[in-house]
Design a protein with these regions (language model features):
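Short amphipathic, basic-aromatic surface patches that mediate peripheral association
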Residues: 2-20
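Extended low-complexity, serine/threonine- and proline-enriched intrinsically disordered segments
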Residues: 20-37
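Solvent-exposed serine/threonine-rich low-complexity stretches and specific carbohydrate-binding patches
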Residues: 40-49
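Short, surface-exposed loop/turn segments at beta-strand-coil junctions that are enriched for proline
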Residues: 60-66
């Protein structure tokens, strides 16, 4: 299970609930094992008690549990027609957000992969 908490920060547009979930985003995770194998997953909204709303997907690691991984998360604004953006927002901010790309390297998932939530 890979997940991202994507919430408004204190630097977000006026009127945004700081810490509030940002819905309708297009979130993709690319997980690359040291052996070169990769897994691409579209993260979709999930909800649970601990994290509340978040983007996630159940995945299989593309390599061994004890390998080192690189993960790239691409966050795109909603596709056309998925979110109505009112005139006042569009005039002030243009769009919900610009594409964001986050890359994390030298990750070990071994401890997490061997745990169980239940």
């Amino acid at each position: 299970h890979i997940e991202m908490l994507i919430n408004w920060s204190d630097e977000s547009p006026a009127g945004s609930a700081v810490g509030g979930f940002i819905p309708y985003l297009d979130v993709t995770a690319t997980i690359v094992a040291k052996n070169g194998n990769l897994e691409i997953a579209k993260l979709t909204p999930h909800i649970n008690i601990i994290d509340n709303f978040h983007y996630a997907q159940n995945i299989k690691l593309p390599g061994a549990i004890d390998e080192i991984y690189k993960v790239t998360i691409i966050i795109d604004p909603p596709s056309d027609g998925e979110l109505g953006i009112h005139y006042d927002w569009k005039e002030r901010y243009g769009s919900l957000l610009d594409q964001k790309v986050f890359t994390y390297t030298n990750l070990s998932f071994e401890e997490i992969a061997l745990k169980s939530r239940r």
